[in-house]
A protein has these predicted regions:
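Serine/threonine-rich, repeat-prone extracellular segments and beta-strand-based repeat modules
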Residues: 332-363
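N-terminal Lys/Arg-rich, disordered targeting/topogenic segments
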Residues: 1-30
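Substrate-binding cleft of extracellular glycoside hydrolase catalytic domains
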Residues: 67, 75-206, 212-214
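Solvent-exposed, low-complexity, repeat-rich "mucin-like" stalks and linkers
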Residues: 295-331
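Interdomain boundary/hinge segments at the C-termini of tandem beta-sandwich modules
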Residues: 370-373
Length: 373
C-alpha cells in the first residue's frame, strides 16, 4: 500500500512538472513572438525612413573634417569635401551623395592593367559622370597609370582625353601614379630600372603637359610614400596640382598639395560600402591659375566682373544656386561657352561659393562667396 501511494505521489509530481514546463514554453513563445513583432515593426519603420530619404534625395550622413588636422598653410582656406569613385562602388545615388556634403568627385575614367599593360575604360565612368554632374557635383576624372616611361604616360593622357571630351570637366584630369603590388611598375622599380626621382617626374609631367595642351587643368595623385621616397613633391609645385593621399588624420607631404585624400573608409549617403574621402582647399576670391598650356593667351576670369542677382539666397530643393552674371570689358559672357559655373557648400545655411572657371578664350578660376539664409 505504501508503495502504491509513493507511485501515485511520483505521478502527481511528474504531472506538475510537465504543466510547469508547458507553462514556461508558452511564456517563452509569447516572449519570442513579442520580440519578433517588435523587430518587424522596427524594420518597417527603418524601411519607411529609408524610402522617405530616398525619395527626397536627402542623406543623414554628412562628410566632416572631425578628427583631421589641417596644415597651417590652409588657415585662410575653405575646406570642401569630396570623394573619388570607380566601378568598384557599384550603383551610386548621386543626389544623396551631394546631400552628404560631397561637392566634388574624381571619377576613374580608365586604367592601365598592372599585369598586361592594356588600356581599359572604367565600366561605370560614363554613367557616373553624367549622373554626378546632373546632381550638381563638380566632376574631375582620373586615370590609373602604370606607365613605365613618358611615351606610355602620353598614351594614357590621350586615352583619357578621348573619354572626357563630350563631358563638362570642372576639376583637373589626374594621373593616378602608384605602385600596385606585383604590378609592372613595381616590378621595374624593384629591378632597379627606375632609380632616379627625375624618372618619375618625367612620367607624370608628360601626362600633365599633354592634357594641359588641350586646355584642361592637370593633377598628380600619389600617396605619401611615392611623393616622399620616389619623387620630390616640391619639384611638382609649379608644374601640376598635387592630390596627396595620407591617412591617420594629417598630411605631412612637403609639396604644395591642393587636394588631400584623408581616408579610404568614409561612409557617404547613396553609396553602399566605404569610399575614399577627399579634401579640397579653396581660398575665397583668390584667382587660381589653370596651368594650361593651351590657354596662355586667354583672358583670366580674375579680370572679369562677377555679380550675383541678390544679397542672399534660400535653399530650394535642398540647395542654393544663385543667378550669376560674368562680364568682361562691358560684355556679358555666356555660361558654357566662356565660363563654367559650379557651386560648393551650397546645401545648408551659411556661406556658399560660386566657382567660375574660364572656358574657351577665358582661363583660371575663382570661388566667390554668397550668403544662404
Amino acid at each position: 500500500m505504501g508503495q502504491l501511494a509513493d507511485k501515485e505521489t511520483k505521478q502527481e509530481i511528474v504531472k506538475k512538472d510537465v504543466k510547469k514546463i508547458k507553462k514556461r514554453k508558452r511564456s517563452y513563445m509569447l516572449t519570442l513572438q513579442t520580440i519578433t513583432a517588435a523587430l518587424l515593426v522596427l524594420l518597417i519603420l527603418v524601411g519607411i525612413l529609408k524610402l522617405v530619404f530616398y525619395i527626397g534625395g536627402i542623406s543623414r550622413i554628412k562628410l566632416s573634417d572631425e578628427g583631421l588636422t589641417h596644415s597651417d598653410r590652409f588657415e585662410n582656406c575653405v575646406v570642401v569635401h569630396g570623394i573619388d569613385v570607380s566601378e568598384h562602388q557599384d550603383e551610386i545615388k548621386w543626389k544623396k551623395v551631394k546631400s552628404s556634403g560631397a561637392d566634388f568627385v574624381f571619377i576613374r575614367a580608365g586604367y592601365r592593367s598592372a599585369e598586361t599593360g592594356e588600356l581599359n575604360e572604367d565600366a561605370d565612368f560614363r554613367k557616373n559622370i553624367k549622373k554626378a554632374g546632373k546632381a550638381g557635383i563638380m566632376c574631375g576624372a582620373y586615370f590609373f597609370s602604370q606607365a613605365l616611361n613618358e611615351a606610355e604616360a602620353v598614351e594614357e593622357a590621350e586615352y583619357l582625353l578621348k573619354l572626357v571630351k563630350r563631358y563638362d570637366i570642372e576639376m583637373p584630369l589626374v594621373i593616378d601614379y602608384e605602385l600596385y603590388n606585383g604590378g609592372r611598375l613595381q616590378q621595374k622599380v624593384e629591378a632597379g630600372e627606375m632609380p632616379a626621382s627625375s624618372m618619375y617626374h618625367d612620367v607624370v609631367l608628360a601626362f600633365c603637359r599633354r592634357v594641359e595642351k588641350e586646355g584642361y587643368e592637370s593633377a598628380v595623385y600619389a600617396n605619401y610614400d611615392m611623393l616622399t621616397n620616389y619623387m620630390d613633391s616640391t619639384l611638382l609645385d609649379d608644374e601640376a596640382v598635387i592630390w596627396a593621399a595620407q591617412y591617420g588624420g594629417a598630411c605631412d607631404v612637403k609639396g604644395n598639395y591642393r587636394y588631400w585624400q584623408c581616408a579610404e573608409d568614409a561612409a557617404v549617403g547613396g553609396i553602399s560600402g566605404n569610399v575614399d574621402h577627399d579634401i579640397w582647399y579653396i581660398e575665397p576670391n583668390r584667382v587660381y591659375s589653370t596651368l594650361a598650356e593651351g590657354k596662355k593667351n586667354a583672358v583670366s576670369v580674375g579680370d572679369c566682373k562677377i555679380e550675383f542677382d541678390a544679397d542672399s539666397y534660400k535653399l530650394k530643393n535642398h540647395k542654393a544656386e544663385p543667378e550669376v552674371t560674368v562680364t568682361y570689358d562691358g560684355k556679358k559672357l555666356r555660361q558654357g561657352r566662356h565660363y563654367i559655373l559650379s557651386f560648393v557648400k551650397n546645401t545648408e545655411s551659411g556661406t556658399g561659393y560660386a566657382i567660375v572657371r574660364g572656358e574657351g578664350k577665358y582661363k583660371d578660376w575663382v570661388a566667390v562667396p554668397f550668403t544662404i539664409n
